[in-house]
Structure formats: structure tokens, C-alpha cells
Amino acid sequence: MWWLWASLCCLLALGDARSRPSFHPLSDELVNYVNKQNTTWQAGHNFYNVDVSYLKRLCGTFLGGPKPPQRVMFTEDLKLPESFDAREQWPQCPTIKEIRDQGSCGSCWAFGAVEAISDRICIHTNAHVSVEVSAEDLLTCCGIMCGDGCNGGYPAGAWNFWTRKGLVSGGLYDSHVGCRPYSIPPCEHHVNGSRPPCTGEGDTPKCSKICEPGYSPTYKQDKHYGYNSYSVSNSEKDIMAEIYKNGPVEGAFSVYSDFLLYKSGVYQHVTGEMMGGHAIRILGWGVENGTPYWLVANSWNTDWGDNGFFKILRGQDHCGIESEVVAGIPRTDQYWEKI
């Protein structure tokens, strides 16, 4: 009997796979198919004339890796608003509004971490300290604790590195902001742009424990440390409470090719091939036309999606968005002299 049951399961799975048409990840056909499904989001072109290898490299997070211990949350008596946007809650913290660009490198795991860490330093010092924490420092110096640099990494390892080794400051490519700005240039998503083409190639830059010329203090003096790092349970309310009390978090989820085409609305996977795991920064939540969503910042520049941001279905662990949330608290004692 068992073989009948197994055969039936295989046939159902095969039937489901065949019921979803196959499209090239960036095709007009995929855009049109999504927009005809009467779903909760709209598709359009964000990338033109780029290699599929580049698109897959953008998704550089290893899902299901080791996690730090969960922090115990007491949310029973906490009244959470129907909608929340960290940009509005902490308007004096400019990094919350920022969208970065990881370039041709699978460094999303590092960007999601340093973006949320930057936000939390500002929030937990009551905006007395505002710093862009360096994705370059984390990407290049974390080593095997975090994974494999531009070839992918673990968000949990990134937060652990912050607490153990610290991270220096560093802004966007060619910004000359901070100790170690990002060294990988943005690449051109569009046909007639001025930036270099997007490819799936490129090595991880070398770890350098020296700040760029003209910057002071020294590399060692510029380090910012975390007090602790932890996982957040996949409970919708626990994640909301964590953001509400402590600021944006890093999350990760499975990316399918239809997500690459996101323009507006609340993303729900419709069709398309699996591209890989992707880490992002979750900064709020809300409800749009009756559909609950997470408000999320991506790291694919502002010409992707909704000015670099997107919304994704909340409360159903859609594409695993609620299963890989990590966060941490800054060590505020290091800033007492500045405060």
C-alpha cells in the first residue's frame, strides 16, 4: 500500500510543477503572467541585460544554518499598533531610510546585518551616535565564522562577529565615509546606464585592518561592538515586538525569480525558479488592502522595487521570511563619552 501512496504523492508533486509555467527569470512573459494572476503585487522590469549568474549571486545567504540562542520575549501584555514604520518612529536616525547596493557580490548577509546594526546604534543612543557600519569590514574580515564572503554567508555569524570582534564604520562605494567604505562598485541593471555591467563574477576583497587615507581615528579605535546577538522566534508577534522595542532586524528568505520583478504591493510567490537564499532588513509592518505585510529594505540599489524597499506577506512564514530572524543589542557603554 505504501508504494501506492508514494506514487500518488509523486504524481501530485509532478502535476503541481507542470501546472506552473516556466519562464526566463527576466522575461516579459513572466511579468505578464504575474500581473494577470490578480495577486497582491505588481511586476515590472528591474533588471535588463544582466547575467542570470549575477541574479543568483545576489542571493548569497545560506539558509538553515546555525542560529544564536533565542531571546525570551514577553509579549502577552504588549499592545502593538496595526502598522509600524521604523523610519517614522525614529526620524532622527538617517540610516533607517538608507538603501545600499551590494554590487556583483553575494554579500546580502553582511548588508542586512550592518544596516540593522547601524539603525540600532542610533536608536539605543537616542540618536546621539549615528554611524554607517561597514559592510566591507564584515564581508572581508569575518572569515569562515560567517561563510564564504561574496559566495554567501550566514546572518547569525555576522551578528556574532559584531559582538566578538567589532565592526568599523564605512559608507557606500566611493563615498569616502568612515574607516572602510564598500569597495565593490554598483553595477548597471539597465541597458543604457553608465555603471559597469552586472556579472556573477568577482572575488571577495581582502581584509584590511587599516582605515582609508585621511580618516581618523585608527582602525582599532573605530570599532563598534555589540553587547549580545540572538535569534527571534518565528512568531509574528515576537518579531513585531522586537522591531517595536529595539529597531530593525535582519531576516532571510527563499527568493524565486518572480521576486526579481517586484515593483509594488505585497509580494506573494506566484511562479518561477528558486534563485537562492537572500538576507534583508525588516523595519516595520502594516496592512494593505486587507493583506498583512512586512516592510523590508533590500540591498539592490534604489532603482529596484519600490525605491529599494518591498512588502511581503506577513504571518504565514511566506518563503521562510519569519524563520531566520536575528538581531542584537549594541554595547552603549562605548559611546558614553560621546553622549
Curated annotation (Swiss-Prot):
Q: Which gene encodes it?
A: CTSB
Under Enzyme Commission nomenclature, its number is 3.4.22.1
Q: Quote the subunit structure annotation.
A: Dimer of a heavy chain and a light chain cross-linked by a disulfide bond. Interacts with SRPX2. Directly interacts with SHKBP1.
| Gene source species | Macaca fascicularis
- Annotated signal sequence is 1-17
Looking at the keywords, is Glycoprotein present?
yes
SUPFAM superfamilies recorded for this chain?
Cysteine proteinases
Q: Where is the active site?
A: 108, 278, 298
Which reaction is catalysed here? Hydrolysis of proteins with broad specificity for peptide bonds. Preferentially cleaves -Arg-Arg-|-Xaa bonds in small molecule substrates (thus differing from cathepsin L). In addition to being an endopeptidase, shows peptidyl-dipeptidase activity, liberating C-terminal dipeptides
Which InterPro entries does the entry mention?
Papain-like_cys_pep_sf, Pept_asp_AS, Pept_cys_AS, Pept_his_AS, Peptidase_C1A, Peptidase_C1A_C, Propeptide_C1A
Tell me, in one coarse class, where this protein mainly resides.
other
This chain belongs to the protein called Cathepsin B
Its placement in the membrane is given as:
Peripheral membrane protein
Subcellular location field: Lysosome; Melanosome; Secreted, Extracellular space; Apical cell membrane
Enzyme's top EC category: hydrolase
User: Sorted alphabetically, which PANTHER family does this protein's record hold?
Assistant: CYSTEINE PROTEASE FAMILY C1-RELATED (PTHR12411)
A GO molecular function assigned to this protein is: cysteine-type endopeptidase activity
Q: Which residues carry this modification: N6-acetyllysine?
A: 220
Q: What are the alphabetically sorted keywords of the record? A: Acetylation, Cell membrane, Disulfide bond, Glycoprotein, Hydrolase, Lysosome, Membrane, Protease, Secreted, Signal, Thiol protease, Zymogen
